[in-house]
């Protein structure tokens, strides 16, 4: 493991997903899934998200589209919240999901809208 890349990834991951969420992911990891937490932090967040070629906002928009296409509702909710943290608006999220409907299918988009609305409701309730 490259410590500098891991540390950079940990910083970005906490900034996007929230410190509490990330700390909980590591706290609840066991011997079985800790290597996945380390891999995601170093390579996904440190190497990929840490590159300078795209802004965090743009990376969030791309992730929303890809995760919608893959039908990964849990991860989508995490990344909807992260996208909002990166300055993506609810209107921009809606536009991503409308494009998902055309290129990935209406069922994928319907599920994505459903997941996003749950995140929005949770955020609105916490205000």
Indicate where each model-derived feature is located.
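Short amphipathic alpha-helical surface patches that mediate protein-protein
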Residues: 81, 98-101, 117
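Short alpha-helical scaffolding segments that buttress acidic/His motifs in well-ordered protein cores
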Residues: 40-44, 61-68, 96-101
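Residues at alpha-helix boundaries and short interhelical turns
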Residues: 52, 70-73, 87, 104-107, ...
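Acidic, glycine/proline-rich low-complexity segments that act as flexible tails and inter-domain linkers
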Residues: 1-57, 85, 110-127
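Mid-chain, well-packed structural core segment of small domains
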Residues: 61-94
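A glycine-rich phosphate/pyrophosphate-binding beta-strand-loop-alpha-helix module
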Residues: 91-96, 111-114
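Substrate/cofactor-recognition hotspot
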Residues: 99, 106-110
């Amino acid at each position: 493991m490259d410590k500098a890349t891991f540390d950079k990834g940990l910083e970005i991951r906490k900034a996007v997903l929230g410190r509490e969420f990330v700390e909980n992911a590591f706290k609840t990891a066991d011997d079985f899934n800790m290597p996945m937490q380390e891999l995601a932090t170093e390579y996904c967040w440190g190497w990929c998200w840490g590159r300078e070629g795209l802004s965090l906002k743009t990376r969030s928009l791309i992730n929303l589209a890809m995760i919608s296409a893959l039908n990964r509702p849990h991860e989508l909710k995490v990344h909807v919240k992260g996208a909002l943290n990166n300055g993506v608006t609810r209107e921009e999220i809606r536009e991503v999901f409308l494009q998902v409907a055309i290129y990935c299918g209406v069922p994928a988009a319907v599920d994505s809208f459903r997941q996003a609305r749950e995140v929005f409701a949770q955020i609105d309730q916490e205000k």
